[in-house]
């Protein structure tokens, strides 16, 4: 029998109200644990990231984690027992009635910090000097990728990357899907990380260049080039000629000192485990507070992973108008699920469950740790550019690539992506992979940029948040993330309706 007297390195009770604790390392049956003088004997093995009961939980009673219910016991759970999907279930139902119960404190202003970025002619700040090739329709994807590959032969050092963003849409779409495609493409065309953009069309698609221009608005003709493949003899050579001009234009920009208040940072998680809500997500939350306290902006999305934690965000809304928008954000996504005859609460993936996440409430309460403690300043519809500094909520699904693309489309120059299982994906902007556990960091150093697993062995969330803030300023100043070093750039658009 082992006796663990130092709970800091073996398990944690996240909130004083919790009737559960989380194993920070794998714990063996019959181990005796000490929590502030209270002794617990484990009745079974507890894998890392998984929960065990700190007291007897009767059948039908709430299982408490993060100070909030994450479901209810389906049978009596003795103290020291493993708690997971075999003995607990979600408590979520359908639409709820909400009331505004204001509960937040404003952040104390922090000393201004700076990064070395690119000042665009429209006044926006970018963190990369790239050339983007944006197809209007999937029919020209191969042309776009071929042009990007060939253009690398003459890419100047002043250009960070020449990237194509293929996608399967732009035609055979109707209604909201067609609107979403046009809006997201227009958002990316205007993004400040792109020094120059080639908009590549076919000519006969629904979202043709003339239609897309209505969404883009006025453009700098030196920065944005348009090419219709059906209207030129050799679309490859014509595209390459455009890219050469864009490279010359991009070379006129140099990095300069810019205030961090101009940073817009997206926040996302995926492949989460039981430690994500204890290490990585709270660290991102601490980062978010630090940036907002300096006048910057963060965006939180993946709305289905707010279900079960939405009231915490609602009560942090800065006023009733933002509260009403947040209620609509949540209920609209619940109605989206219901319109497709899908249950609202069947979210945690097999990987989530293997990592210790038992219910959607469990996942959501961990997920929303990324929001820190700042008031919710605004709520954005899908594809809507950010307009208000501070913490913004964005309407987008939980899918990693769709949500991360939506963050970039709303103006994020960088995305912070926490994970407990690991993923190699990228988004249109630098995507910082943040591990919740050190094992992932050690095993996947070609994927992971920043490790929060060290918090299991000590250290503090505020200190880790400061370290992450310093790291993000380095990335904003040009330090490549692992996905960029691998040459990865991806995008995806939210689809809801029929395909013609």
Report the location of each language-model feature.
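Metallocofactor- and cofactor-centric catalytic cores in central/energy metabolism, strongly enriched
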Residues: 2-414, 423-424, 429-500
